[in-house]
Amino acid sequence: MGRTLPALLSLLVLSSISLPRGLGKDAETFLSLQSRIQEIFKQSEKSVVRVKAAREQKADQKVRRMLKMGSGFFISKEGHVLTTGLLKDPDRIWIEHRNSYFLAERIGHDPLCNLSLLKVSKKPLDFTYVSFSKPKEELAVGSILVGVTCALEFKIAPTYGIMQSHEFLFGKTLFPTKMIRSSLPLGLGEVGAPVFDLQGRFIGITYAALPDLGSSFLLPASACSRIRDDLLLSGKVDYGWFGITVNRTLNKDNGFEILIDDFVEGSPGSKSNLRKGDVLKKIAGTSIRSRGELAQASFFARPGTFVEFVVERDSRELKIPVEVALRPMVPKNILAENGSLPDSNLTDSTNVGGNEDINGSQTP
């Protein structure tokens, strides 16, 4: 019977069917799940839009018109829409909402995470928006997720999957912050959509597809909130910077630890009481056990503030305040224009889940 449960779940989510006798409580569970997915879809469908961006490009005395589309969703009653970057420097942006079309302008863009904040010139008469609430605890592996997306020119529809893992890396490429890997299948036009848990809480935005694995990456709600706030305020995102170079090395317990290797000249790290060889333990109360967690700390650090570094030096634990500076240069996002992660990151030596160069360095 265990093998029949996933198949029955898929059938029940897609349509109402007659349940075979004898399933008992399992049948009630299936119907409850189906009903909950339908409720989440009904609650959120008026907030989701299809976003289109067009740009004219002249080449060889010919004008080529480029059109990209994706999903997006309202995040305020004023008509702000969060979506992916779509096209670089588009000539025109518009959204489709319940068979109506609305012009939009780009308020701001974050090249690091490839998110854009739009605002419609005229608000729809009947729309809702997605609220960002901070979850009390981290999303557990195996949690059921519900996405509401705009695939190609089809109607807005729900899709579902499970939370598979939290990831900091894709091959040897370091994500700007911790990502959620899910089993949500993403096709064309479905990047930029909101994803919810079964309580209807916003979990994240569809960020990138992994079609060969039947998986996808979601940018978590906490990161979306960080980006949204800065884009609303200034149209750009100011990320923090410590100016330290680190190495990941084996310790005496055959585990890994993060050592400070060097400092960028004139950086906050170089001006602090941190020293080369210090073992990083915590930043702003968060444990640092990998380069990904260091990148995460840098992602959420606000320029102009101080954060507390906890380091181990000569078998002693020290607490050292470090001022956060504005990151001098924001790298481009790693996504291809279609919302997929480039195949060049997946080679025999850099495959997902493969061995990582433990002596690699990073300067957050």
List the predicted regions and their residue ranges.
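Active-site region of chymotrypsin-like
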Residues: 47, 54, 65, 121-130, ...
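Terminal peptide-recognition signature
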Residues: 46-51, 72, 79, 83, ...
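Conserved active-site neighborhood of the chymotrypsin/trypsin-like protease fold
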Residues: 27-28, 56-57, 74-157, 188, ...
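C-terminal cap/linker of serine protease catalytic domains
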Residues: 28-41, 126-127, 147, 151, ...
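Short, small/polar residue-rich loop motifs at catalytic or cofactor-binding pockets
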Residues: 67-69, 89, 187-191, 213, ...
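PDZ/PDZ-like groove recognition
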Residues: 185, 232-297, 312, 316-323, ...
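Bacterial N-terminal signal peptides
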Residues: 8-16
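N-terminal activation segment of mature serine protease catalytic domains
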Residues: 21-86, 92, 140, 144-145, ...
